[in-house]
């Protein structure tokens, strides 16, 4: 409503299930809309944005993929969406583009990740690139990751990549701390582990990491964790 009051045109792209009442906008691009007729509904947010870019460029999907395919592939892997259909093609193409990328920011990130000059798989992206990009938002502002991906100065890119590395290391340390405290709680009250749903809480647990910690526990114990 504020954007409308300011006389601006709003276009929304999303990949989540929309509410029954949609926001006021000139266009809402979301494959999960009730009136959507697109054949593939499992794109991540960047995949939807890529579709919009292609549409704004006269429907030239090949050009959009050539320009932004590696970014969309990284996002697709990082968001852990279903790697079938269009997503599978997007990741296959994007990994090839990533191996030859000229994006200064990405090159700095690849070097910091120890992946520069190596062949890429969805696994190397998921465990090497994605955590460092995600760390920007988990420990600080996602703006740092955006600045890195848009950066054209090698020195500045190296500094931004180093900052993401520091945040990722901080994320790892916080994850270990949370898991250790959970282990202590479980040791003090063994009956907790016999519940079908496990609920843990702690002072000062970072909101950007508790979801990761819950996922780790789910992998270890095959139980739902809150």
What are these regions (language model features)?
Residues 1-24, 28-31, 177-181, 204, ...:
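N-terminal small/polar loop signature for handling phosphorylated ligands or for N-terminal nucleophile
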Residues 2-5, 48-52, 90-93:
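Alpha-helical scaffold elements adjacent to nucleotide-binding pockets in ATP/GTP-utilizing enzyme cores
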Residues 24-77:
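Short alpha-helices
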